[in-house]
Amino acid sequence: MKNYWFENKDADANGTCLQFRISIDQDFVWDHFGPSHFSGESVDDKVLAEWIFENQDGKVATLYDWKGSSQRNEWHIGAHDAETAHLFEIWLSNFHKREMQKQKIRA
């Protein structure tokens, strides 16, 4: 089974909630996914940056900071269920590893 995710800022992320946490440098996130899909601050000032992803099956996951974490390498993974979040976490971890290996090869 392929596990592929792509950014889709128009995907319906309503009802997603924290399922997992992941540590990835903020520069990596911004460099690879571009500007946040979320503009401004949330109504409750708890989210400053968020990206929405969708997989080949139409499942939605979000990657976001929570309460403007002072440690900008800590991100939350949100989804409608833990299985979807876990698939996204696997994809993101593997994507991060591949991109970091590419950087080492170039250096």
Where in the sequence are the language-model features?
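Amphipathic alpha-helical segments
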Residues: 19-39
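A structural detector for beta-sheet-dominated domains
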Residues: 21-23, 54, 78-80
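Short, intrinsically disordered, mixed-charge
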Residues: 31-35, 68, 93-97
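Amphipathic, interaction-prone secondary-structure segments
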Residues: 35-66
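Intrinsically disordered, low-complexity regulatory segments enriched in Ser/Thr/Pro
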Residues: 61-87
